[in-house]
Amino acid sequence: MTKIYMDVCCWNRPFDDQMQARVHLEAEAVLAVVSEIERGDCQLLHSEVVDLEIANTPALELRQRLQILIPRQHRYIRCDQKISDRALVLEQRGFAGIDALHLACAESAGADVFLTTDDRLQRLAARHEHFLRVRVANPLTWMQDRLTN
């Protein structure tokens, strides 16, 4: 079973302004991934980093929507010293603190893919793909690949 880690950019996508075609398509891809998780076709890896980031979302309504969207059946990753140490190494490679923590959580749990809609993070991950222990992809691109293979 494919193990998927999704950052908060991904989880937010269905609630972003859908007027841009790209945003709309990425939102549909995120919802398709959620459907696959709910059907048991994929396993969601969820972390306390995601929970913390969502808890710090200033808009109460958005925070509540995010909490409802995330499937309840998931494997939960708690941060430990190993994850913190790996995140520090990733920060030294240029990853932002929260992104480094997300990546370290995904790696620690053996994720097959780390999904994000953050272009900057995707570009940086592509430059360091030999160093990362998880594939980083856009949910739309990943879903298209999954459907054609």
Where does each model-flagged region fall?
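Acidic, PIN/NYN-like endoribonuclease modules and their adjacent C-terminal/linker elements
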Residues: 2-3, 17-27, 36, 92-93, ...
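PIN/NYN-family metal-dependent endoribonuclease catalytic core
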Residues: 5-58, 71, 76, 139-145
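Alpha-helix capping/helix-boundary segments
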Residues: 10, 50, 83, 101-102, ...
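Short, basic, glycine/proline-bearing loop/turn elements
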Residues: 15-19, 82-91
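Acidic, metal-coordinating catalytic cores used for nucleic-acid/nucleotide bond scission
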Residues: 52-56, 95, 119-121
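Short, aromatic/basic amphipathic alpha-helical patches
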Residues: 60-66, 124-129
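Helix-adjacent hinge/juxtasegments
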Residues: 63-88
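Short beta-strand scaffold positions
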Residues: 78, 97-100, 116
